From Swiss-Prot:
Organism expressing this protein natively: Dehalococcoides mccartyi (strain VS)
NCBIfam families, alphabetized: RDH, TAT_signal_seq
Phylogenetic classification of the source organism: Bacteria, Bacillati, Chloroflexota, Dehalococcoidia, Dehalococcoidales
Keyword Iron attached: yes
Protein name listed in UniProt: Chloroethene reductive dehalogenase
Coiled coil feature spans: none
Induction note: Cotranscribed with vcrB and vcrC.
Major subcellular site: membrane
Amino acid sequence: MSKFHKTISRRDFMKGLGLAGAGIGAVAASAPVFHDIDELVSSEANSTKDQPWYVKHREHFDPTITVDWDIFDRYDGYQHKGVYEGPPDAPFTSWGNRLQVRMSGEEQKKRILAAKKERFPGWDGGLHGRGDQRADALFYAVTQPFPGSGEEGHGLFQPYPDQPGKFYARWGLYGPPHDSAPPDGSVPKWEGTPEDNFLMLRAAAKYFGAGGVGALNLADPKCKKLIYKKAQPMTLGKGTYSEIGGPGMIDAKIYPKVPDHAVPINFKEADYSYYNDAEWVIPTKCESIFTFTLPQPQELNKRTGGIAGAGSYTVYKDFARVGTLVQMFIKYLGYHALYWPIGWGPGGCFTTFDGQGEQGRTGAAIHWKFGSSQRGSERVITDLPIAPTPPIDAGMFEFCKTCYICRDVCVSGGVHQEDEPTWDSGNWWNVQGYLGYRTDWSGCHNQCGMCQSSCPFTYLGLENASLVHKIVKGVVANTTVFNSFFTNMEKALGYGDLTMENSNWWKEEGPIYGFDPGT
């Protein structure tokens, strides 16, 4: 079959968009030369980062947000619990103790539901505020243990003791022993270049189900500042045991009970990671962090607060699955793999520094491919040498300065209100030392998600997106001249319009796992 090519100039390109004139020079000066449309659409930045030409790479630890590394430091609040439980030095008590800094769950839920009924007249939230019985059934299905698992969970995964619907890797940070390991417990180390190792992990992680991947150099002092100062060892309930072992996989041990309070995370020379009542140690020989994100089902996401919750919880369950599979893969190569879904540090922070996205107005990261409809980055700390991936500039951070869609739909008013980024949010639970967008997370509730759903970048990569949408991304990445115009077009065309209407979703044959293959 012959491939059709049509030669077209940049000016003709922009004329087709109706944008010829001011700003052409800005785009032309920074864009590479393409002979035809096919070359532009199919081009990639390089072999290790499957990103299009307009996603520009920056220097390591120099993202589009401005960071003052003299001020920026490790966050004292662990697992984001500072938002829910009071001052950063407060001991871990329970997930229910959130009244110190945010209203109770029921009160907040009523507030969110009232706002949605006002925004969507005639909508009936049903028994639990998600819609009809089908919506509740879908949510129930994805928040239960895996089929046939009973109360103890299934295989490598198990429900959180006090967080219904969320799963963790039940063998803890190190993963379980493996039946195919050599009898003596030793595994020869895989020998590969850091670049080849990254490509290998990317292939494996995407096969397991990851959406995007990245890597960071933990040996860099700046990278260490992304790790929490303290945490509760393991993502388990307080006072429980966890079986962990070294990279040989056969030599598993029963370690002490998990402390019921946060302990410092320290970097020390050690053969294995360990913890006790005084500290938790990460071996300094573990100099790489492999990261991955998972996209959320876009059509579910648009039905904010309805069946959208099922899409969100599906991703949390998959985090445990994909993360543990990546962990096991690295272990059988003969290396340590310390997997902790949310415990190493703020997820959006890693996504911003590892080149998978840029910080957006919501304070969370916007993925260059999946937009705001993604979760991560998940992190696996390892001594396998991995080439780090640099931060990117795709124009998204700048775009958010003139796009207020997520701010306008936010029920709690927590999304960054000012036009420009700021150094200080005034909230003690936000990390200081960077010029970025600040969100008051204390008002958020898991029955919402409007900011993610309404983000224009979430829908620019859908299957039914036209060639124009791909060009829009290229223009946004190279000039800010048309940002306001594109925002107005987004509002007019309604790609990210929110809805509480679920009936059509039940009648349509959706893509596998709800992910649009166009992404």
